[in-house]
Design a protein with these regions (language model features):
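Expand to "…catalyze enediolate/carbanion chemistry for C-C bond making/breaking, isomerization
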Residues: 1-173
């Protein structure tokens, strides 16, 4: 049976280890240059950069070749954008401008399969031949919330109550 690839970033964070993730590679060739350097993952920029549904599959495959976990910052907190990004090969998503508890809950709902969320039942290339894929994918997906607005700070206590968020990232906004 095929195993789900390890999310190196999530694994290391769960073990209290430091992770190294460069931001900005724009094509698979550049990602391959990062591969031998030992990074845990690559941050693919889809909000302020050219990463989109057309190139996520190739960029994430380049990460796979070197055992790096691809994280994609998407351009909006919209369920279809989030789950499609995972379906195309991302192991994590970073969601900009999450300001309320309900917005954080929407991220989880779009990122996780039932019973934790409402992500559509599609296995993508990562799930082919993987026993219990949906359960394993729920454990492996990395969800990152970006706090870029003062309203998020004002709502921080409520947002932190939301389960299944892995990283709370304070970003300049």
């Amino acid at each position: 049976m095929v195993e789900l690839r390890d999310n190196k970033i999530k694994h290391n964070l769960n073990n209290g280890e430091i992770v190294a993730i460069p931001m900005g590679p724009l094509n698979g060739d550049i990602i391959e240059h990062f591969g031998p350097l030992g990074f845990d993952g690559i941050w693919l920029e889809g909000e302020h950069g050219p990463v989109d549904f057309n190139n996520i599959p190739d960029l994430t495959r380049a990460c796979d070749l070197w055992g790096m976990s691809p994280i994609v910052r998407v351009h909006q907190n919209e369920p279809g954008v989030i789950y499609r990004t995972f379906d195309l090969g991302a192991q994590g998503v970073a969601i900009p401008h999450v300001n309320t508890k309900s917005e954080a809950e929407a991220v989880v709902s779009a990122s996780k399969f039932a019973p934790l969320g409402m992500r559509g039942s599609f296995t993508s290339r990562q799930g082919i031949g993987v026993d219990n894929y949906f359960s394993k994918a729920n454990d492996a997906t990395l969800t990152i919330l970006l706090f870029e607005d003062i309203v998020a700070v004002n709502n921080l206590d409520e947002i932190l109550e939301v389960d299944h968020i892995d990283v709370f990232y304070v970003a300049p906004g």
